[in-house]
């Protein structure tokens, strides 16, 4: 993979549980935090950045520090997101969240008698709410104390996290208040209402949503369920990566004709994960790299909202104006800046970022519909776009798994986007 290199010092992450507890107590912060750095102007010509990966420690054999039940104090420390906590989250969400399949995409490679394909899809669009967000939302709320659940929760989201929190809260019998932007897709607003959540509308920027949610949490005593800058939410999203590694291992075992109970070496692989605020990207990166240090994890952003690329390239959180990120059709990735916790984790675990154009996104939506019979929203198609149109920027060998984050799109809007994709060369 041809990635431009730059110097970066991975953040120190304590491994001792007692040290983690002390650091957590010391670093509990306000619900809204001023983002480090100022807008410095996106370089739209840059396609990707290289992220040096620190050595990945062996999986811990001690109990994880992620407590449960939790108070409504936020768990901000990146050290709380570990393979152990992600495995624990997988047990908590079992039976609520779908273990989405790995689907082969495209034709088998020539001359392969086993019919193996290089590209695989992880369609989180098949979740009960049509997106991966139920994972983090359910785990977050389920591990709150009974007292906190009785008081209720508040969240801010452009759509899919809102649906995840609304559904999780309904399943757990918890009051939910959701702060949404005035330009949120209608279909997502309707589904949040259907699950019984109260909706508060604000302006289009993520800062406005975060500030209003923090205000409601303070006034009404609600627990904030963060969309991405929240260790519990990130941990829940990381279960996607855990499943990918397990499913690829099972696939290799079957294709190698290894008897049940036998062992086979997992072939090299790459995971493409969308980056918005960084919740799923950081959770998946932690899970995958903790299990397979030789795996490659690449983030994918719209070129019109590539703040994470700039942040990781510059070694500080860079903010893009709301009117700039608002240009992309990928509404789930219109965050103006990456979260503080995801930033720390991605600096340590992510291998690189690829950006995709608007035409590439809609063309990927067309290909998903035609070849995989999957209905994807624009944000759900960015990783497939990276595979289809930027394969030369990825490792030359091994399987490539694209995480398709969601499929919540208004039918009329979906038809318009497909028509645009066909016109662009679909």
Residue ranges and their predicted role:
Residues 1-2, 10:
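N-terminal targeting leader peptides, primarily classical Sec-type signal peptides for secretion
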Residues 3, 14, 19, 23-40:
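Polybasic, low-complexity intrinsically disordered segments
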Residues 7-10, 14, 20, 49, ...:
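Short linear segments in intrinsically disordered or otherwise low-structure-confidence regions
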Residues 2, 23, 45-47, 60-64:
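Low-acidity, Ser/Thr- and Arg-rich intrinsically disordered low-complexity segments
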Residues 21, 40, 60-62, 260:
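Intrinsically disordered, low-complexity serine/threonine-rich segments
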Residues 6, 45, 52, 63-426:
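PLP-dependent amino-acid enzyme catalytic core
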Residues 19, 28, 38, 42-43, ...:
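Intrinsically disordered and other compositionally biased segments
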């Amino acid at each position: 993979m041809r990635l431009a290199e730059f110097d970066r010092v991975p953040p120190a992450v304590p491994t001792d549980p007692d040290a983690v507890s002390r650091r957590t107590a010391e670093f509990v912060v306000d619900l809204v935090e001023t983002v480090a750095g100022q807008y410095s102007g996106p370089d739209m010509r840059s396609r990707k950045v290289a992220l040096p990966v620190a050595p990945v420690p062996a999986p811990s054999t001690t109990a994880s520090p992620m407590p449960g039940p939790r108070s409504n104090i936020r768990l901000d420390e990146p050290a709380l997101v570990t393979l152990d906590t992600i495995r624990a989250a997988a047990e908590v969400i079992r039976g609520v969240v779908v273990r989405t399949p790995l689907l082969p995409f495209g034709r088998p490679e020539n001359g392969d008698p086993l019919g193996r394909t290089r590209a695989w899809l992880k369609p989180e669009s098949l979740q009960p709410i049509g997106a991966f967000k139920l994972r983090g939302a359910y785990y977050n709320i389920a591990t709150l104390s009974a007292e906190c659940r009785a008081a209720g929760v508040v969240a801010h989201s452009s759509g899919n996290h809102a649906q995840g929190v609304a559904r999780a809260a309904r399943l757990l019998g918890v009051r939910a208040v959701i702060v949404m932007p005035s330009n949120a897709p209608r279909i997502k607003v309707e589904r949040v209402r259907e699950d019984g959540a109260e909706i508060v509308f604000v302006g289009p920027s993520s800062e406005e949503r975060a500030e209003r949610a923090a205000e409601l949490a303070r006034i009404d005593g609600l627990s904030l369920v963060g969309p991405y800058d929240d260790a519990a939410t990130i941990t829940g999203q990381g279960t996607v990566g855990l499943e990918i590694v397990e499913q690829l291992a099972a696939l290799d075992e079957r294709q190698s004709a290894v008897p049940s109970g036998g062992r086979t070496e997992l072939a090299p692989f790459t995971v493409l994960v969308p980056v918005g605020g960084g919740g799923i990207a950081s959770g998946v990166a932690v899970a995958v790299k903790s299990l397979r240090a030789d795996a490659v994890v690449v983030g994918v952003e719209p070129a019109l909202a590539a703040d994470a690329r700039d942040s990781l390239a510059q070694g500080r959180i860079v903010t893009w104006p709301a009117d700039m990120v608002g240009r992309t059709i990928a509404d789930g990735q219109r965050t103006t800046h990456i979260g503080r916790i995801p930033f720390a984790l991605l600096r340590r675990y992510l291998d690189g970022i690829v950006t995709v154009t608007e035409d590439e996104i809609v063309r990927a939506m067309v290909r998903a519909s035609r070849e995989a019979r999957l209905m994807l929203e624009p944000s759900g198609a960015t990783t497939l776009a990276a595979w289809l149109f930027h394969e030369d920027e990825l490792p030359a060998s091994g399987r490539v798994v694209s995480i398709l984050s969601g499929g919540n799109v208004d039918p009329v809007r979906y038809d318009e986007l497909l028509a645009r994709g066909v016109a662009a060369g679909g």
